[in-house]
Amino acid sequence: MKHRRKLFLTKDIYNLPPTDQVFIKAMKDNIAFHTKNCPEYKEILDGFGFKLCDLNSVEDLWKIPPTPTSYLKNKTLLSKPYDKLLIRTTSSGTGGKKTLSGYDKSSALCALSMALKVLRFHKLISLMRTNYIILGVKPDKNNQTATAKALTYFTILAPAKKIEYAVKIVNSEYQVDVDSLIKAVVKFGQEGRPVRIIGFPAYFKLFLTELIARGIKLNLHKNSKVLLGGGWKTFFAEEISKEELFAMANETLGISRQNFKDHFSTAEHPVNYVACENNHFHVPAFSRVILRDVNTLKPVENGVPGVLNLITPILSSAPYGSIITDDIAVLRDNCGCGIASPYIDIIGRVGLSNIRTCTQQASEFLKNL
């Protein structure tokens, strides 16, 4: 997959037009590989009447039948044996269903190259020894979720002195150890080293609320950072705006606004989307994003809400080149931060009862091309 290698060597990561041709070639290579190595995926594409010759430019990417993430939680699609993958993951399994995924060596190298470029651009790489608060559980043989691995993965961005996990395993059960967490952050503050807090926004809010309840106010090192991602999920009733959360944290921890970063990625689409200074998720050169009409699945124009379709050739381990989520979003231009590419504004979720099955919806959509 030489075109994929070339794409993931891109240095100007938010300048999309110069990469359009290599992106479409990489996607064609990706689809050809998966149809050869994943019979179930080939059957899906054949059933929808899709042919590689349909792809001639990035404007044709919408013709690729998008696979719903909900479908992948019920059906495993892999192009290489799961137990042979270099890195094996599952999705977080909200609702009790999980997606099996992972990286072979070539996919992992592409992911590493991409991550270093994106995270360096957003000034998240440092050589300073740093203490970490991970608002999650440490990955082990019993916990292979992409979320757990991603939280720990972010600790390589600055050399770790100490890592404190919020969730501990006690008698084979997960328990939140609030006292240890509070003691750790107070100790970290006294040490005078940078502190990085990583996790879900809901967990971060609960952490801040506990600090406030105990009357604890800190002024952490000026290079301390907060990296959040994953949304509020089952804690939607607790949701507050990002600006409220940032203000709450600044008051409690003394971390400046520019050191808060929101991050977006999924097990099925492992591309790094990191928020800009205006807190927007810009599309990097390693992916393309389409918003689709919820009823017809046809693409809508920028500025019009639609179901989020994420496209990337990063994985040769699984045929997840074009996946459709249950998120409703808008693709917008002209952020004002200086980044040229459009950005994703996620505004809500579609209930599963409102989404027809992959085969029914996609086949109807393709028949009308």
Name each model-derived stretch:
Residues P17-Q21, A32, K36-R88, K98-Y103, ...:
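Active-site diphosphate/adenylate-binding microenvironment
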Residues M1-Y14, Q21-A32, T155-L369:
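Active-site glycine/GP-rich loop and adjacent strand/helix microenvironment
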Residues I87, M128-I133, R193-V195:
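Generic beta-strand structural signal
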Residues T89-S92, S101, F207, S265:
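Conserved catalytic-core segments centered on acid/base and nucleophilic motifs
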Residues K105-L109, S113, S126, K141-A148, ...:
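Short, amphipathic alpha-helical segments
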Residues G49-K51, I125, K217, I255-S256:
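Short coil/loop linkers at secondary-structure junctions
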Residues S92-T147:
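Conserved adenylate-forming
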